[in-house]
Amino acid sequence: MLPPFFLKRYIMKYDAVIFDLDGTLTDTLEDLKNSVNYALSEFGFPERSLEEVRSFVGNGVKKLIYLSVPESTSEETAEKCLEVFKTYYKEHSLVKTKPYDGILPMLCELRNRGVKTAVVTNKMQEAAKDIVRIFFDGFIDVTVGQVDGVAQKPQPDGINYVLQKLGVSKDKAVYVGDSEVDCFTAKNAGIPCIGVTWGFRDKSVLLESGADFIVDTPEEILK
């Protein structure tokens, strides 16, 4: 990792910037929490708090639900709960979800500079594409969510796929995310990671997980 005095100030010189979605470009936490609690209530399970759901996200919806149901829940019931969640979230993924402040101007500036952009997320593919289409149409070149044949983060498959699609080498790319999963994904792909502090994890988690840079605002990504 770079020395601490480099963490806040650096010059970005990349041909491609790849973003995580939840907690990085968009604040999806309320919709995720409400969908989780709807699914839990269908099985008579206790609800989860916003902070609990915050700590559970990052590894895909299956892990989210498996962490949300009571520990004694059978795999069969957990899978049924997962399906209820998927169905409900598909219809309610955009109720409160919105881009974080400063994201759209940052993406616009990247586009003006000719920088290619992509999203690699563990979110369900259809939901990810819907969010990108609604909020970032024209600003994201490739979106890869949870799809068959592409291993989820922290495996590097998604990053490798978009780099091939964009025609960009690893030494000209950077990954931007808000969690330890994102840091590990970038490391596994062999590219640097910019950790953002406005998402679902604390700055200390990002540093411990090996983030190469830390930014507190979207504007800092442009420096």
Model region roles, listed by residue range:
Residues 66-105, 113:
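Metal-dependent phosphoesterase signature
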Residues 27, 48-52, 56-59, 73-76, ...:
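Residues at secondary-structure transition points
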Residues 36, 103-133:
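Substrate-recognition element of Asp-dependent hydrolases with the DxDx(T/V) motif
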Residues 10-55, 66:
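Active-site neighborhood of HAD-like aspartate-dependent phosphohydrolases
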Residues 2-11:
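Short, Lys/Arg-enriched N-terminal segments with co-localized hydrophobic residues
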Residues 39-40, 60-74, 131, 162-163:
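Helix-loop "lid/cap" segments that line or gate small-molecule binding pockets
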Residues 10-15, 51, 111, 125, ...:
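Asp-based, Mg2+/Mn2+-dependent phosphohydrolase catalytic module
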Residues 34-38, 63-67, 84, 105, ...:
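Alpha-helical elements of Rossmann-like donor-binding domains used by nucleotide-donor carbohydrate transfer enzymes
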